[in-house]
């Protein structure tokens, strides 16, 4: 019999399983549900195109929506990030964050999500991401590519605030020149965290 392939290790699944609140015995294996969600994230396939070795797509979607609304997926992400940091010999909490944006060319998304990034000449969507010093994602916000970095940064800082990430002793966030001025003031006022602009040609960068 072929050994099943898992996106998550047994250790990672233990962390995820400990967060699940579904008490009633399920017809489907919850790890397979979790793996199906990982497969969707990895491949970007449509729900209805999930391979048949997973649970029915409607069941997977039901659990995905339930775990999203309950905040389980976000909590699992943060717990897994902390575990990986600890395994790498670092403290679970990071004191330094890094923010940047990335525009992606897309043609099949809705008009509300699509726009033109004037600087990069890309029509599609843009992601604003805050990572820790290991490059692990703390939080991410996606929107149309024509949204200015200043507005996108506020959205991702709001996401950071909603996570109560200030409780993890985040002392500074590094950014490039597109995030100075009003954005730095917004972050300082909202979370009392300084934003340090690092020039791309800085020898220490």
Functional labels for PLM-detected ranges:
Residues 1-205:
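Short alpha-helical elements
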């Amino acid at each position: 019999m072929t050994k099943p392939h898992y996106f998550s290790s047994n250790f990672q699944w233990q962390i995820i399983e400990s967060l699940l609140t579904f008490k009633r015995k399920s017809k489907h294996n919850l790890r397979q549900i979790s793996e199906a969600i990982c497969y969707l994230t990895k491949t970007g396939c449509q729900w209805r195109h999930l391979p048949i070795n997973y649970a029915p797509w409607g069941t997977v979607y039901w659990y995905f929506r339930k775990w999203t609304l309950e905040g389980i997926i976000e909590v699992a992400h943060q717990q897994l990030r902390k575990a990986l940091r600890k395994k790498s010999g670092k403290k679970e909490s990071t004191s330094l964050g890094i923010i940047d944006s990335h525009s992606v060319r897309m043609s099949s998304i809705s008009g509300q999500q699509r726009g033109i990034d004037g600087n990069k000449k890309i029509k599609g969507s843009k992601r604003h991401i805050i990572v820790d010093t290991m490059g692990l994602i703390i939080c991410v916000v996606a929107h149309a590519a024509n949204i200015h970095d200043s507005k996108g940064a506020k959205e991702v800082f709001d996401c950071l605030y909603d996570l109560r990430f200030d409780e993890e002793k985040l002392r500074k966030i590094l950014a490039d020149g597109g995030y100075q001025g009003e954005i730095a003031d917004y972050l300082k006022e909202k979370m009392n965290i300084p934003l340090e602009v690092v020039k791309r040609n800085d020898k220490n960068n």
